[in-house]
From Swiss-Prot:
Binding site for substrate: N61, V62, E63
Residue ranges occupied by any CMP/dCMP-type deaminase domain in the UniProt entry: 136-251
UniProt organism field: Arabidopsis thaliana (Mouse-ear cress)
Protein name from the UniProt record: Probable inactive cytidine deaminase 4
Residues spanning the membrane: none
PANTHER family in the record: CYTIDINE DEAMINASE
GO terms (BP aspect): cytidine deamination
Active site positions, chain numbering: E76 (proton donor)
Record family assignment: Belongs to the cytidine and deoxycytidylate deaminase family.
Subunit structure: Homodimer.
């Protein structure tokens, strides 16, 4: 039986593949490329990052069949989301095989990986009353989407948002990761799909059966329309719901 390819490698797993230092990351290039999903362009891309935990994280490009390429996830976006979703705070080195260079990072923690607490709560009192005492690990999409929104990095729009997906009883989450200029932002659905690909053992997007988006009441930038388009196309049987939230006062 072929071993399931992974998006995160421990130090021991990397060593078994002959990777013991940053310059060895190139040895993982072919394995990383296989994980890309590019049904439109056919161009597979990958980046590899060495985190402060000594784990190696993979990022690949993801295209969604039937949707314009601007809905896609770039390999760099995938890598950043993979790091953030796994609570890594430092990226020590990054190999970008398709552009043939190794970048080392010796400066402070990248802003996108700084943990956030947006102090959000559900605006609907019934929804607020249903939030579990341990929303990080419960199976309720409403709880998990709010938890994701609270981690959202929305430094430009000031409109944090989070998404939770469910497939065969397993919940996957993601949040908006904003950037500007030539660095494209990543929406909460795409970030949740990174989590789905990284932990979903190769399942297809069409197997996703439920999704919840949580975003601000008065958001000047809403994720709802984009989320509906994306989910309707890749997971036609998915039940999609939206809940509003507001920012609470600081303690």
């Amino acid at each position: 039986m072929t071993q399931q390819l992974k998006f995160i490698l421990t130090r021991e797993e990397a060593a078994s593949k002959g990777v013991s230092r940053p310059s060895d990351l190139v040895k993982l290039e072919e394995e990383a490329m296989i994980l890309a999903r590019a049904p439109i362009s056919g161009v597979q891309d990958a980046v590899l990052g060495l985190a402060s935990s000594d784990r190696i994280f993979l990022g690949v490009n993801v295209e969604f069949e039937g949707l314009p390429l601007h809905h896609s996830i770039s390999a760099e976006q995938f890598l950043v989301a993979n790091l953030a979703l796994n609570f890594e705070q430092e990226l020590h080195a990054c190999l970008i095989p398709s552009r043939f260079y190794l970048e080392s990072f010796e400066e402070d923690v990248p802003l996108l990986l700084v943990p956030q607490n947006n102090r959000l709560a559900h605006s609907d009192p019934f929804s607020a009353a249903e939030i579990c005492s341990n929303p990080e690990h419960c199976s309720h999409l409403k709880c998990r989407a709010l938890t994701a929104a609270n981690k959202s990095n929305a430094q430009y729009s000031k409109c944090p948002s989070g998404v939770a997906l469910i497939c065969e009883g397993e919940v996957y989450g993601g949040w908006c990761i904003e950037s500007a200029a030539y660095n494209l932002s990543l929406g909460p659905v795409q970030a949740a799909l990174v989590d789905f690909m990284a932990r979903g053992e190769g399942k297809g997007f069409e197997m996703i059966t439920g999704a919840v988006l949580v975003e601000m009441n008065d958001a000047k930038v809403s994720q709802e329309a984009t989320a509906r388009i994306l989910l309707k196309t890749i997971a036609p049987g998915c039940n999609f719901s939206v809940f509003r939230c507001h920012k609470t006062a600081e303690n």
